Design a protein with these regions (language model features):
Chain B
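Dinucleotide-binding Rossmann-like beta1-alpha1 core, especially the glycine-rich loop
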Residues: 47-154, 313-314
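Active-site substrate-recognition segment that forms the wall
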Residues: 17-24, 34, 44-53, 60-80, ...
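C-terminal catalytic lobe of FAD-dependent flavoproteins
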Residues: 317-412
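Short beta-strand to alpha-helix junction loop
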Residues: 89-92, 122-132, 170-189, 300-305, ...
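Helical element adjacent to the flavin cofactor pocket in flavoenzyme catalytic cores
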Residues: 169-228
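N-terminal Rossmann-like FAD-binding beta1-loop-alpha1 element of flavoenzymes
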Residues: 4-31
């Protein structure tokens, strides 16, 4: 499991859900049930969710309330999934999205 | 200020095409436009389907099925009415202009309107579809040289994303697509480069007529004199005609349309089924259309239409189930009861010219329409016989009294 | 009571919860819909149920209010159909509500609709505002509150309004180094007189407490200052900030300083989320510096019969007033359904009206001090992205204006501004203001970017699987929707 040099979780006063593994860009990452995908990634120090179509510039979570679509990533082969509104599951397959993202079409 | 010889009212694809072809003749031309919600160009899928449209595919077949379901047509009438040969010839000639147009527009305006040679596939789901396809295959007005009958295996091979639950498909070669907005923008910018004056966001309030002759156009931004006025006002053509005292039997016909998020290339052909048509555009989004509804100038969208278009799309391409809908919107087609455009001069008002009533085929028929209007103004020999499309007194009478019009019934 | 269609309440924040509580108490059939996993909205958002959170001994006033509201809703939850993880895609003026949840969608015909969709942070474009590490203050606050994760190590907070202060304190609490709060105005709420003047309003106490805490936390607050530019290659690394002209908030370019920060929290006030009231063709009005609000009568009824708008989604007033507005609408909607008599409705709503009236002056005052001034628009350069989704630069908008575009809709057609996934929420408020300034036009002339259904993401599969419920008492297609289990007993 990829162990980030930092874990930004606050542990005082809270007991998280079950520890699980998610796959982020091919690497195993620690997450806890009840966390949003964005939260699990932030905790692991990853704030970049995607690069844009036109200018290939990097974006990350901005509004945090599901409204801005900046935090979208490809989750379980479905691009443009809002990571702030999607909750982690054991084995969830998450990819940093480039432009429109890759679909598994057939 | 230079004197305008020609003023075009309407900045949709037809108005812009006319501006381009007239400017190309070196004639001083001005286009006046007030963008309106519901303009047909902005709700088009950009299909160039001369064969498909002429024999009732695209929206025609969807509408036809809905009529049968509502009990308005007998269940065994699996053949949508075909349009006259003159329309097919017009559409084919116009379609043939696109390959050279694409270079010309790009050179002048820098705009690529994304002309793509896709072909059109009609999917056969059941025996009724096969019977319909057989009729088309056997009786196509241009012979079946442009039509291929594909087996399910052949469809699977060329379009793997299409459902395997089909009995076959007809491929219409030469039925292609463009980006409709880019086409209109391209014509407009090319016209501007050729010296046309483009006035946008300006409402036309009247057409001035002196002694039976057009003398100019009144707008909210003042009066502009001109010798010719071209009515290219789409669904609003009747209102513009009225300003010149000309009765134009054009009425708005709503089409609702769905656009998906951008997807990787999953379709190389445009698809027509009896539920919907589907076209993937250059940016990757997939356009799914369309309803045919007579609801006045109402541009609402309706849940039942969204539902049936989505069902149709998922049936044809199961993978689309996971795709997200980005937007649903609607446009108002300039409908005519005989489904033919209204072109050319009218009796009684010198200098007034129609370029309206293009219904479902404005994108496809824009180049030839533009060319013909420019030839008419320049008094050149016409590249196509215009007679079937003139608003003669007989045609006007039949259009205004036409009880047979399909579209007088609202179907959702 | 006749077999009636339900009251549909859209949004389960303070306003929607208030509405649902009162409608249910009055005996009306009602459905409460929210996109989140649980009711609560942004301000009273609950933790994931997978988390066990030790309740603090000393709750803040806001936490107390939230707790009470959740308890009240729970008491009547068996009388309400609560559809969580459910999006509303569109509302029609004939009172149809289109929803989706996972792989299904449907249309509910409602007797009454109460729209309580809340607000979002007003976007102010400037160089670098799209970099990862730049977030809204509301987003930061709710992220910390529900996820217990540090969004960065060193933070700078900028914008206007009291939410900046509470966010700064919250970040400090969890060990983030908060460099400063940059307040664009010099608002009266930050002065010591404020509590003396408005002491009877709950919210004034909250602000005073937050300010005191900020002082104890040693976090400086700079008035008439804001962020000019955020620098960084892949993510936010440093921030260039400076002073604003107090009159018009124009940036004073020779005052800039640069500090290192990896988290920038922005909050320039709020914009009501009026997509659904727009789709339902309710009438709206515009207040300079504040924005578009929904026109309502004293019972919170919009110009469309049977459609209410409450809380920050109608007009920004904060959570306390939102709740009262929701309650009033819930009571009136129940009366419109003939669940209660007019006299009863009057009686039930009396105290909520009186609370609202007592807040009225305070609200007007707060509107004045949280509005933005147009000088902020000068922070954007030609190259600044003004539409984040479609990557439209300010220069593209300028070009469209040169070509004759005189309103937002025309700019949209020429540039794709507002055509992206957020449907113009992150560009329309700032560019509307920009067009007004540049063309010397009113907000009504400049217009808005028309929302189009679906206003939330939904798959074709879900729309193909649509149930149109004519009589809501039969075959409730939404029975299968997960209610999140939050109030399950």
């Amino acid at each position: 499991m990829k162990t980030s040099e930092k874990d930004l979780r606050i542990n005082k006063g809270v007991i998280r859900g079950k520890e699980i593994e998610i796959i982020v860009d091919g690497e195993s990452v620690k997450a806890f049930e009840g966390e949003s995908v964005a939260a699990a990634l932030f905790a692991n120090g990853q704030r970049i969710s995607r690069s844009t179509t036109k200018e290939n510039s990097l974006r990350g979570m901005y509004c945090g309330i599901g409204m801005c679509f900046e935090c979208v990533m490809t989750i379980d082969n479905i691009p443009n999934t809002r990571t702030c509104q999607t909750f982690v599951r054991e084995g969830m397959f998450i990819e940093t999205q480039q432009a429109e993202g890759k679909w598994k079409t057939v | 200020m230079k004197n305008n010889e020609v003023i075009i009212i309407g900045g949709g694809v037809i108005g812009c095409a006319v501006a381009y072809y007239v400017a190309k003749k070196g004639i001083n031309v001005m286009l006046i436009d007030q963008p309106k919600r519901g303009r047909a160009t902005s709700a088009s899928a950009g299909g160039l389907w001369p064969l498909g449209e002429s024999i009732g595919l695209g929206c025609g077949v969807i509408f036809h099925k809905a009529m049968i379901e509502k009990g308005l047509l007998p269940a065994d009438s699996h053949i949508p009415p075909q349009l006259p040969k003159s329309f097919l010839d017009f559409a084919i000639q116009s379609n043939e202009m696109f390959p050279s147009l694409t270079g010309a527009i790009k050179e002048l305006s820098g705009i690529d309107f994304e002309y793509e040679e896709t072909s059109l596939l009609f999917l056969m789901y059941d025996d009724a579809d096969v019977a319909f396809a057989k009729t088309l295959y056997g009786n196509c007005p241009c012979g079946n040289s442009r039509i291929d009958w594909l087996t399910p295996f052949e469809v699977k091979h060329s379009e793997p994303a299409i459902t395997h639950n089909i009995l076959g498909a007809l491929r219409f070669n030469g039925d292609n697509q463009v980006n409709p907005y880019a086409l209109a923008d391209g014509y407009r910018e090319a016209a501007r480069k050729l010296g046309a004056t483009i006035i946008t966001h300006t409402e036309v309030t009247g057409i001035k007529i002196n002694a039976g002759r057009v003398s100019g156009v009144e707008t909210k931004a003042g009066f502009f004199p001109s010798k010719y006025v071209v009515n290219a006002a789409g669904a609003w053509a009747a209102q513009v005609g009225e300003m010149a005292g000309v009765e134009i039997p054009v009425y708005p016909v709503r089409g609702q349309i769905i656009g998906t998020e951008a997807m990787p290339k999953i379709l190389s052909a445009c698809i027509s089924t009896n539920d919907c048509y589907i076209a993937q555009k250059h940016h990757g989004e997939i356009i799914i259309g369309s309803t045919t509804e007579e609801t006045g100038f109402n541009t609402d969208i309706t849940p039942s239409a969204i539902n049936s278009l989505c069902k149709g799309a998922v049936r044809a391409i199961p993978f689309l189930e996971k795709a997200k809908v980005k937007r649903v919107w609607s446009g108002l087609r300039p409908g005519t009861a005989d489904e033919l455009p209204i072109l050319g001069k009218v009796k009684g008002v010198e200098g007034y010219i129609n370029a309206c009533g293009h219904f479902r085929t404005g994108i496809l028929n824009s180049p030839l329409t533009g060319l013909l209007i420019s030839e008419m103004i320049n008094e050149d020999q016409l590249s196509f016989p215009i007679e079937p499309f003139l608003l003669s007194e007989e045609r006007l009478q039949s259009l205004t009294n036409n009880e047979n019009s399909n579209h007088k019934t609202s179907i959702q | 009571m006749k077999n009636r269609k339900p009251i549909v309440i859209i949004g389960a924040g303070p306003a929607g919860m208030g509405a649902a509580i009162e409608a249910a108490r009055a005996g009306a059939s009602c459905i409460l819909i929210d996109e989140g996993r649980f009711p609560g909205g942004q301000v009273y958002r609950k933790n994931s149920k997978e988390f066990q959170v030790k309740e603090k001994e000393m709750l803040t006033a806001e936490q107390k209010r939230g707790k009470k509201l959740h308890e009240e809703l729970e008491e009547v939850s068996d009388k309400i159909k609560i559809l969580t993880s459910t999006s509303v895609l569109g509302v029609w003026k004939n009172r149809e509500v289109m929803w989706s949840s996972n792989d299904a969608s449907g249309v509910i015909e409602a007797e009454q609709i109460i729209i309580a969709t809340g607000a979002y942070e007003r976007p102010v474009p400037f160089p670098g505002w799209t970099l990862p590490g730049v977030m809204t203050v509301g987003g930061v606050k709710s992220f910390i509150k529900t996820m217990f994760i540090k969004p960065g190590e060193t933070a700078l907070i900028a914008g206007t309004g009291p939410l900046l202060i509470s966010t700064a304190n919250k970040l400090h609490d969890i060990g983030v180094n908060v460099l400063a709060v940059l307040e664009a105005g010099s608002p009266s709420w930050a002065s010591p007189d404020f509590i003396n003047q408005w002491g009877d309003a709950d919210f004034a106490h909250d602000i005073a407490a937050d300010l005191l805490e900020l002082k104890q936390n040693n976090i400086p607050i700079l008035f008439n200052h804001t962020v000019f530019k955020i620098n960084g290659k892949d993510e936010a690394e440093s921030v260039t900030y400076g002073a604003l002209n107090p009159e018009n908030w124009k940036p004073l370019e020779d005052t800039t300083k640069t500090v290192n920060a990896d988290l920038v929290a922005l909050g320039f006030g709020f914009v009501p989320n009026t997509e659904l009231t727009e789709l339902a063709e309710c009438k709206h009005e515009f207040y300079p510096g504040i924005g578009w609000t929904v026109i309502r009568d004293e019972w919170m009824q919009t110009s469309q019969q049977g459609i209410f708008a409450v809380g920050d989604g109608a007009r920004i007033s904060g959570a306390i007033i939102a709740e009262e507005e929701g309650r009033i609408a819930g009571i009136k909607a129940a009366q419109n359904c003939e669940a209660i008599q007019a006299v009863d409705a009057e009686k039930r709503s009396e105290k909520y009206f009186s609370r609202i009236h007592s807040f009225e002056k305070f609200r007007k005052h707060l509107n004045e001090v949280t509005s933005v001034k147009s000088g902020l628009l000068e922070l954007a350069t030609h190259k600044t992205l003004v539409c984040r989704c479609e990557e439209v630069r300010l220069s593209d908008v300028d070009k469209a204006i040169t070509e004759g575009a005189g309103d937002l809709q025309s700019v949209k057609l020429l540039t794709r501004l507002g055509m992206g996934a957020c449907q113009g929420k992150n560009c329309s408020p700032s560019m509307g203001m920009y067009l007004c300034e540049k063309l010397n036009k009113t907000a009504y002339q400049v217009g808005r970017i028309n929302p189009r259904p679906p206003v939330k993401p939904v798959t074709l599969g879900a729309l193909a699987n649509m149930t149109i419920t004519k009589d809501s008492h039969q075959n409730d297609s939404y029975d299968a929707i997960n209610t999140g289990g939050y109030y399950e007993k």
